[in-house]
Amino acid sequence: MPIYDRQQRKQLDELVTDFAEHKVGRRQFMQRALAVGLSASAATSLLAACGGGNTITSGNNTSSSGPTKSSTVDLLNVWTGEEKDSFDAVTAPFISQNKITINAETTRDLSATLTTRIRGNNAPDMAILPNPGFMQQLAAQGKLIPLDSFLDMNQIKQDYSQGWLDLGSYNGHLYALFYKAANKGTIWYNPKTFTAGGYQTPSTWSDLIALSDKIAQSGKYPWSMGLSSAAASGWPAADWIAQIYLSQNGGAMYDKWVAHQIPWTDPSIKTAFQTFGQIANGKHYINGAPQSILSTGFQDASYLPFKNPPAAYMYYLGDFTEGFITGQFKSAVPGTDFNFFPFPTINSQYTGAITGGADVVVALKNTTAVQALVKYMATASAQEIWVKRGGFTSPNKSVDLAAYPDAVAKASAQQLTQAAIFRFGADDLMPQAVENAFWKATLEYVQNPGQLDSILNSMESTAAQSYTS
C-alpha cells in the first residue's frame, strides 16, 4: 500500500459508499471527488462506475457448490515498478506449470476501486488489500471466499503464527493470507559510530533513555525525527505511539484502544504520548526541535545517522527504512554501515511485541484458477522467489531465512515471524476521521506538549462521533 495516498484512498472509499447508500447525489459526489484531488474526467469515470448508486449484491462468495473451472485470474493490486517485477517473477513458474493467465490490474486507490467494482457486479477474482480492516468489512458483507475451504489448514497453521491467522479470520473462518509484511519494531543506527562512541544497543526503554542522555551530554544529537508527509504528516509519530502503546499495555488493551472501547483520555493513552515525548520533546535530543521535527520529511530524517560525520545516532521507523538508506548511500553495507536493534522492552510482560503491516491476499470468486493461485502464493517456496530479490518480508515461518539477501533483512524477518505479540499499526485500523485526527494530534503534541490533555479530549470527541456514525 502506498503510504502517501492513504488519506485520499479512504476519502474515496467513503464517498463511493455514501453514494451507493443514497446519502449524496451526483452533484455532491462530483464536488467531493474533485475536493479529494481527482480530475474531472476521473471523477466522472468513478461516478459512472458506481452505476447510479446501485446497492451491493451478494457476489460469488460461497464454496458449497465447488469452484468454477477457469484458466484466468483477474487480480487487483497496488504493486508497481520493482514490486510488480518481483511479483511477475513469483508467478512466472506458476503460469508456466498451470497454463493459467494472470491479468493484474494496478491502482493507487485500491479500496475505492474495489468497492466500485463490487457495486457494479464486476469484482475481480482476487485482490491485494492494504489492511485487515477492509478485509473484515468485505467478509462481513459476504464478498469473500473463505480460504480455509480449500487451503491445507494443517500446513497453514504450521507456516503462520496464530496471531496472523487471527488477523486474517472473520467469524471463525480464514479469509486473508498475509503476504508482504512490514516490521515496525525497528530502530536504525550506524554500527561504526556506535563502536566509535563506545555505545551499546539498548534492550530496555530505560537503557534507551540512558544512551540518549549519554550521547546528548557529549554535545551530540542522539535522535533524528521527521513527521512531514504532505497531507499525511504525523503518521510516523502515530507509528511511534502505537509501538509504545503495545509495548506498554499488550495486545488486549491495544485492541480496545483501536476499537474505541477505552476513551482517548484513558491514562494508558496519555502515558504512551508522554513516553513518545521523552524522545520528541526537548532540544537536547533532536537538532532544531520541535520545528525541525515538524518540517523535516520522514525519509530525509532517516539519512542523518548515516552521514559522515553523523548528524544523529538513532532513527525509528519500519523495516522499509533499509530501502531509504541503501537508496541514498549506494555503497552502504548492511550490518556494517547500517543496522537496527529491536524496539526496546518497556513492560517486561510484553517483551518482543511489535507493530507492523502487510499486504492482504483475498479471493472474491471461487474458481479453480483462484484456488490454484492462492495455494501457490501461500507456499514458502513461492514467497522465497521475492524474498531473494529483496524488498519483501514474509510472515511465513517456513520461509528459509537464508533466502533473505542480507543479514539485516534476515534479522527483521526473524523478528517479525517470531514476535510474541503482533498488531497492525493502530491508525490503519481506525476510521478515517480518527486516523486523520490522530496524525494531527501528534503534530500538535510535538509543538505544544503542555496541551496534551486538551489534545486527547479533542481526539475523544472525534472518536465518539466516528465510531457511532
Q: What are the language-model segments listed below?
A:
Residues 1-28, 40-45:
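N-terminal secretory signal peptides
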Residues 93-160, 167-169, 192-203, 304-306, ...:
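Extracytoplasmic "Venus flytrap"/periplasmic binding protein-like
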Residues 116-117, 124-125, 156-192, 222, ...:
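A structural signal for short loop-to-beta-strand junctions that line the ligand-binding cleft
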